[in-house]
Curated annotation (Swiss-Prot):
Taxonomic placement: Bacteria, Pseudomonadati, Bacteroidota, Bacteroidia, Bacteroidales
Protein name: Glutamate--tRNA ligase
GO molecular function per UniProt: ATP binding; glutamate-tRNA ligase activity; tRNA binding; zinc ion binding
Keywords, sorted A to Z: Aminoacyl-tRNA synthetase, ATP-binding, Cytoplasm, Ligase, Nucleotide-binding, Protein biosynthesis
Family statement: Belongs to the class-I aminoacyl-tRNA synthetase family. Glutamate--tRNA ligase type 1 subfamily.
A Gene Ontology BP annotation from the UniProt entry: glutamyl-tRNA aminoacylation
Length: 505
């Protein structure tokens, strides 16, 4: 048998913002496909019309595009296996629903929600299965004429899978090994609803995966309990020889490790759980996103890749190309991965440092201008070079280095009490003259000359430098004094020191 080309799919439902766990699933599918020279498909599973949220589909595509997760075919990308939106495949599914009914692997059920609720009250832990289906209104208990009459009179119905009890179903999982589940614990899942003439996830994804020639299904472990049903459906259709390999990914857990990561955890601890900012059209709520929070896409990708997978060594920093080369499903964890959001910040800091000063200046200049400052790209680039090692995000730069653009009008009281001495005003007055006389006004030459002067006068170097920093910055933090003076220029440096002398003397 010839080996089939690897084809994977990411198949989200457009029911809201894409959770970061879903992003990781998409990433792992992409890495696996690219490593094996395969295709990545985007399929939109919009069979649940009641949960459809306008804008969600566009959000999903924009988010994955931002992260560099590229599709070879699918919704918005075209391809030979379309349509790729499940709501556009009604006629395709109906054919396979009829096949299951004709072959005796499914049946029609007319039970109303009220009748089902009554059964749940009557029978503890009720589920619709081989032990209870004989008590219900369905094509197994009604005559063919009664069934036909109900359908023709417009009664809504569902089609349920007919699961026979007492059979061990084997699911071969690429991460977890062989999983065996007895069919007796399975219920007769709904496969199709006449109300909207659409299948449920269980039928639609099996039919689509088969027709789209998907070879590997890589998805979250929440679908593992459904895998036995999916294996049975492949058998019912006679598609066992082309059934894809399964890999069920472990959950992303709360930072504390107790339970699945949720949006509420992000709100509570101050980190996003969505790739992009999300404006909920139903509630008007706005949820933060990694992009808008200042994360670089390569940092998010690197961070997510290591949540539940490792390369087998101590390597942490990996580009997308590195990940494609190293990714191995067998090294995915079976247990959940704690969401370490501080590690995400560390990755962003790393990638920020890797970018050139010019690239960071491109991002920081609009922030500077938003404060009413008119300056040059070259000046911002110089400031960035001094300060980027101190931040995790570009957005943090302003609070650390606004003094490069706005002269201090106040002086930190704690620093003033500690660093401004009785003789600081006199010594800084003399220091000004050293700065005024210095040409060229560079970093190294000015520093060497001023330190030599301080030594010749017998002054304490720390006293003058600390007082000068307070005058130039307004507090006791910042880069080297002579880096600051060179950036500000001679006139501005002198003006700031003179003003501090007048106020603090």
């Amino acid at each position: 048998m010839t080996q089939r080309k690897v084809r994977v799919r990411f198949a989200p439902s457009p029911t809201g913002a894409l959770h970061i766990g879903g992003v990781r699933t998409a990433l792992y599918n992409y890495l696996f496909a690219k490593q094996n020279g395969g295709d990545m498909i985007l399929r939109i599973e919009d069979t649940d019309s009641q949960r459809f949220v306008p804008g969600a589909e566009d959000y999903i595509i924009e988010a994955l595009t931002w992260l560099g997760i590229k599709f070879d075919e699918g919704v918005s990308f075209g391809g030979n296996y379309g349509p790729y939106r499940q709501s556009e495949r009604r006629e395709i599914y109906k054919k396979y629903v009829d096949q299951l009914l004709n072959d005796g692997h499914a049946y029609i059920a007319f039970d109303t929600p009220a009748e089902l609720e009554e059964k749940r009250k009557e029978i503890a832990n009720f589920q619709y299965d081989a032990s209870t289906r004989s008590q219900m209104r369905n094509s197994l208990t009604l005559s063919q004429e009664e069934v036909q009459s109900l359908i023709e009179s417009g009664h809504q119905y569902v089609v349920r899978a007919k699961i026979e009890p007492n059979e061990d179903i084997h699911v071969n999982d690429l991460i977890r090994g062989e999983v065996v589940i007895n069919s007796s614990i399975l219920d007769d899942k709904v496969l199709y609803k006449s109300a909207d003439q659409l299948p449920t996830y269980h039928l639609a994804n099996i039919v689509d995966d088969h027709l789209m020639e998907v070879t590997h299904v890589i998805r979250g472990e929440e679908w593992l309990p459904s895998a036995p049903l999916h294996v049975l459906l492949y058998r019912f259709f006679g598609w066992e020889d082309t059934m894809p390999s399964f890999a069920h990914l472990s959950l992303l857990l709360k930072p504390e490790g107790n339970g699945k990561l949720s949006k509420r955890d992000g709100d509570r601890l101050g980190f996003p759980v969505f790739p992009l900012e999300w404006h909920d059209p139903k509630t008007g709520d706005v949820s933060s996103g990694y992009r808008e929070s200042g994360y670089f896409p390569e940092a998010v990708v690197n961070f997510l890749a290591l949540l539940g997978w490792n390369p087998g060594n101590d390597q942490e920093v990996m580009s997308m190309d590195d990940l494609i080369r190293l990714f191995d499903l067998s090294r995915c964890s079976k247990s959940g991965a704690k969401f370490d959001y501080e590690k995400g910040r560390w990755f962003n800091h790393h990638y920020l440092l890797e970018k050139s000063n010019a690239e960071i200046a491109d991002l920081f200049l609009p922030i500077v201008e938003s404060h009413g400052i008119q300056t040059t790209h070259a000046y911002v680039e110089k400031v960035v070079g001094m300060m980027k090692g101190r931040v995790n995000f570009v957005s943090e730069l302003w609070d650390l280095c606004s003094f490069f653009f706005i002269a201090p009008t106040e002086y930190d009281e704690k620093t003033r009490k500690k660093r401004w001495k009785e003789d600081s005003a006199v010594q800084l007055g003399e220091f000004i003259e050293q700065l005024r006389a210095r040409e060229p006004f560079d970093v190294e030459g000015t520093e060497n000359e001023c330190k030599a002067w301080i030594e010749s006068k017998g002054y304490h170097l720390g006293n003058i430098m600390n007082a000068a920093r307070l005058a130039l910055v307004g507090e006791g933090k910042g880069p080297g004094i002579f880096d600051i003076t060179e950036a500000l220029g001679k006139e501005e440096s002198i003006r700031r020191i003179q003003r501090a002398i007048e106020i603090l003397k």
